[in-house]
Regions:
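Conserved metal-phosphate-binding beta-hairpin within the catalytic cores
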Residues: 1-12
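Domain-scale recognition of functional cores that engage charged ligands
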Residues: 15-18, 23-220
Length: 220
């Protein structure tokens, strides 16, 4: 049926390692030419990091314009999130940035910016959902807002990514562009007479997903 938008992990790209690295490794393991990988996520991310500096489509001016601005990559202290975050750090470093990694409890936040071991970082990427920060760490949410307002640091996955991360964006898109070939019919209620999938607004990695049959019965 063609490509469909199922969700947009704008805030927490937790399938990045599988999509960018493991898929390529499987192709290589099975003697497929690596050029046949279906995506160029790794290379595209590298170029997008460079565009933070060039501020245009072309990345040829990166070396000329880059003045040593640093990116701090941070996650919770679990292996899966750390692996994904360190992959992003690796790509940014390969792009030409000065980078560092720290677990979130090692990062120093103040109205003056984002620090690790006393070093100020101009950019921050945090693999921690904004909704978790808002609910569980309200003071940090306020502080990060002050940091951005004071232009002391740029958060690479800013708070507005929460809107795109929500499954609710799929309903909005369907209402704006009904029957678009890249969209699936989406509603905040079960689709009458149709088999459908129920997802929470902020579900993670398939958690709390249910399959509803056309007769309304939940089969999974």
């Amino acid at each position: 049926r063609g490509i469909k938008l199922i969700e947009f992990n704008a805030d927490t790209p937790t399938s990045l390692f599988e999509a960018a690295i493991l898929q390529w490794a499987l192709l290589k393991q099975n003697n497929f030419n690596e050029q046949e990988q279906f995506n160029s996520i790794y290379e595209s991310l590298m170029d997008n990091f460079k565009r933070l500096i060039t501020l245009e489509e072309s990345v040829e001016g990166f070396d000329e314009y880059y003045k040593g601005w640093k990116i701090l990559f941070s996650s919770l202290a679990n292996d899966e999130d750390a692996l994904t975050t360190r992959l992003l750090e690796h790509i940014a470093r390969e792009a030409g940035f000065e980078t560092a990694f720290a677990y979130i409890d090692e990062v120093e936040f103040s109205v003056d910016g984002v620090f690790k071991d006393g070093v100020n970082y101009e950019y921050l990427f945090k693999l921690i959902p904004w909704e978790s920060i808002a609910i569980e760490e309200g003071e940090l949410a306020v502080l990060l807002t002050q940091v951005m307002k004071n232009q002391k640091a740029i958060i690479l996955n800013p708070a507005y990514t929460l809107l795109f991360q929500s499954k609710g964006i799929l309903k909005v898109l369907w209402e704006l562009y009904p029957n678009h070939p890249l969209l699936l019919e989406t509603s905040d209620k079960p689709l009458q007479g149709k088999k459908c999938v129920k997802k929470p607004l902020f579900g993670r990695e398939g958690a709390n997903v249910a399959i509803i049959e056309s007769n309304g019965q939940v089969s999974f």
